[in-house]
Design a protein with these regions (language model features):
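Conserved N-terminal catalytic/coupling substructures associated with nucleotide/phosphate chemistry
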Residues: 1-119
Length: 119
């Protein structure tokens, strides 16, 4: 069994989250900052919540992760990327280590349209 399939077999937990795809860079920035502000974690993109591999467009998903870090996180969050193949499908692993630059904040907008920063 490949390494990525072993990770998927673990299921989602405190330090691992499955994402079918990234639709909102600001939303994923919150997950990334949560990992960086605590013990670190891993995103597996192209994996459904039930653990089934659906695959992803690696370049699109990388762009969304990069945008999340650079546009919405202060300070920006460092991450490592690994692309895994499961048959003909690609799974993008995004590893976020516990940060030495904590706390990280995520830019948001409150109900009144005012910019706010969440840790």
């Amino acid at each position: 069994m490949s390494f990525v399939l072993k990770l998927i077999e673990e299921g989602e937990h405190l330090n691992q989250d499955f994402k079918l795809r990234i639709d909102d860079s600001r939303k994923i920035a919150k997950t990334m900052s949560g990992f960086a502000n605590t013990d670190g974690g891993r995103l597996l993109i192209g994996v459904k919540d039930n653990g089934n591999v659906a695959g992803c467009n690696v370049s699109e998903e990388y762009h969304m992760i990069e945008a999340a870090s650079n546009m919405y996180c202060r300070p920006a969050i460092n991450f490592d990327i690994q692309v895994w193949k499961v048959g003909h499908l690609s799974v993008l692993e995004v590893k976020i280590l516990k940060s030495n630059s904590r706390p990280h904040f995520v830019e948001g907008v409150n109900d009144n349209g005012v910019t706010k920063w969440d840790a």
